Regions:
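Loop/helix patches that line or flank the sugar-binding groove of alpha-linked glycan CAZymes
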Residues: 1-118, 141
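A residue-level signal for conserved active-site and pocket-lining positions in enzyme catalytic cores
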Residues: 60, 124, 144
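Short, surface-exposed, polar/charged, turn-prone segments marking secondary-structure boundaries
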Residues: 33-37, 124-128, 151
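Solvent-exposed beta-hairpin/edge-strand motifs
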Residues: 114-130
Length: 151
């Protein structure tokens, strides 16, 4: 398992693996070049799926910008457990947990495993949707879901 990261193009679902070649990860961004039929530089040029990912990434990066917990916080990485990978950051009495279900099936986050981070908190906020997340019971995760919560 590796630390999750964004490459350029992630925001429009570009993908490539180093198994093919290292250059496969560095494909030209679609659009802006002579002969490009697909233009991801504009909303009109993106597919619905690319637009959804673009909006999700934009929202995540704007939330991250100026966030002291992310910029200055201490980090704890937990050993993946039953396909779930968790990274926590803490700063100034606030916490952020990034939760990733690596499985291609639904899964659960066992909240008791993360008591040292959660402490006495009973709820958290999903940073993307704003929804309240109940920390008193296991958290249901859909296949390959990533969830970022703050409390």
């Amino acid at each position: 398992n590796r630390t999750p990261q964004l490459y350029y193009g992630t925001e429009v679902l570009m993908n490539g693996t180093k198994e093919v070649t290292d250059g496969n990860v560095r494909k030209d961004f679609p659009g802006g070049f002579a002969g490009d039929k697909h233009n991801c530089f504009t909303k009109e040029g993106r597919t619905d799926a690319e637009e959804a990912m673009f909006n999700w990434t934009s929202q995540l990066l704007h939330w991250r910008q100026g966030n002291d917990v992310i910029a200055k916080g201490s980090q704890t990485q937990f050993i993946p457990y039953k396909g779930v990978y968790v990274i926590a950051r803490q700063y100034g009495g606030k916490s952020v947990m990034t939760i990733i279900n690596g499985k291609r099936s639904d899964n659960e986050l066992d909240v008791k495993r993360y008591a040292e981070i959660i402490g006495t908190h009973t709820t958290a906020r999903d940073v993307i949707t704003g929804a309240t997340v109940d920390l008193t019971k296991n958290i249901h995760l859909t296949q390959r879901q990533s969830l970022i919560i703050e409390f």
